[in-house]
A protein has these predicted regions:
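Conserved phosphate-binding/catalytic loops in two-lobed NTP-binding clefts
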Residues: 90, 107-130
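Single conserved hydrophobic/aromatic residue that forms the stacking wall/gate
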Residues: 1-12
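Short, conserved micro-motifs enriched in small and acidic residues
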Residues: 4, 65-68, 121-126
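A contiguous, well-structured pocket-lining segment that forms one wall/lid of small-molecule binding clefts
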Residues: 13-90, 99-110, 138
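Claisen-condensing/thiolase-fold acyl-transfer catalytic domains that form or cleave C-C bonds
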Residues: 101, 122-139
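Acidic, glycine/GT-rich loop-and beta-edge segments that sit at the periphery of enzyme/chaperone cores
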Residues: 137-157
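Surface "functional belts" at beta-alpha junctions
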Residues: 97, 114, 155
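Active-site metal-binding loops of divalent metal-dependent hydrolases
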Residues: 95-96, 120
Length: 157
């Protein structure tokens, strides 16, 4: 299970029971848009240390439950962001956008919002997309000096 990556989790999780085990949903008690998956990852590691596969719960059930905890968190935080901003259209990109369960849950939970997903062939690691954009900007001469101060608490919006 520790070797699974983005689409590996999705592939293993289908079509099993995503509520077989209740993994934590981090930072849900706060009204903020922040989220953290560190407790979820730790919970899975501890769970798997003691896990014994049985007729009532398989490793696929565990992975499906783990995936559901991630999807639930992302959907809830997205709902909160929509409530705060009143946007009517949103793009979901990066590797996580390839997850079928996330796509379905977002569309079902936010029917009033136009949610756009790139074709699966474009749902890759954000670092690659950012690097590519950086190369395009650099080649076109669109870049800034590297002489600036560090602002660790700089707001994104």
């Amino acid at each position: 299970i520790r070797d699974l990556y983005v689409t590996g989790v999705q592939t293993c999780a289908l079509p099993i029971y995503p509520s077989a085990y209740r993994f934590p949903r981090g930072l849900m008690e706060r009204e903020s848009l922040e989220f953290s998956f560190s407790g979820l990852k730790t919970s899975l590691l501890y769970f798997m240390d003691d896990f014994k596969e049985s007729d009532s719960m398989t490793k696929k059930d565990v992975i499906a439950s783990y995936q559901q905890a991630i999807v639930d968190t992302l959907v809830e935080k997205m709902k909160r962001a929509i409530d705060k901003t009143n946007v009517k259209r949103c793009v979901i990109a990066g590797g996580v956008a390839a997850n079928k369960s996330l796509r379905e849950s977002l569309r079902a939970s936010l029917p009033e919002i136009q949610i756009l997903f790139p074709d699966l062939s474009y749902c890759t690691d954000n670092a690659a997309m950012i690097s590519f954009l950086g190369e395009i900007k650099y080649q076109s001469g669109d870049y800034e000096s590297l002489d600036f101060g560090v602002k660790p608490n700089l707001k994104l919006a």
